[in-house]
Amino acid sequence: MHMTVLFASPRAAHSNTHALLVPFLETWRAAGHTAEVFSLFDLHIEPCRACRGCQMDWEYPACVLADDMPAIFDAVLRSDILLLAAPIHSWFCPAPMKAALDRFVYALNKYYGPRGRGPSLLSGKSLAILTTCGYRPEKGADLFIEGMRRWCRHTDMRYVDALTERHLGYDHTFMDAEKETRARAFARLLMQP
């Protein structure tokens, strides 16, 4: 199985989300699966303009904006599963991920053009979420998770599940053996058909 990971932490390799992603990816790859990781804070991603230029081509994203999204579009279209890996700030994902998600809604869903409703290029793909937050998961990540469930219904994707781990504060160590075990178990869960 091939996975595209959209990683969106402003603290990059020093982040709690990255600490959780490492054992997840080790387990995923050790089982013979592949993953392509995009660190969104390192890329140039313009916000969607809702210009509908992408709606003229029903076979390809065809976004008219010139930035780093074409490589992400291509990777997602080649993937079986999309993993959103991000900290939760203000009850939602950081801005680069939100910008990418908005671009997917238009460029990969041909619902808005002059020819009427076309296909979703994401149809049948799976989506999973790996997040970290400061609140209890049911109060910190719940709105983002619900938003992504609705996003999956809109895009005709299959929502699989989410792993959310809590950080108790900068004076506490985030990563521990229990979190690592849950990250590895989450990778194994996503390997199931």
Question: Locations of the language-model features?
Answer:
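Short coil-to-beta-strand
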Residues: M1-M3, M157-V160
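N-terminal beta1-alpha1-beta2 submodule of the flavodoxin-like/Rossmannoid cofactor-binding fold
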Residues: M1-N109, P114, Y170-P193
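A generic structural signal for alpha->beta connector loops
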Residues: G32-T34, Y60, G124, D156-Y159
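Short, glycine-/small-residue-rich phosphate/pyrophosphate-handling segment
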Residues: Y112-R158
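Beta-strand-loop-alpha "switch" segments that mediate conformational coupling across diverse proteins
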Residues: D161-R166
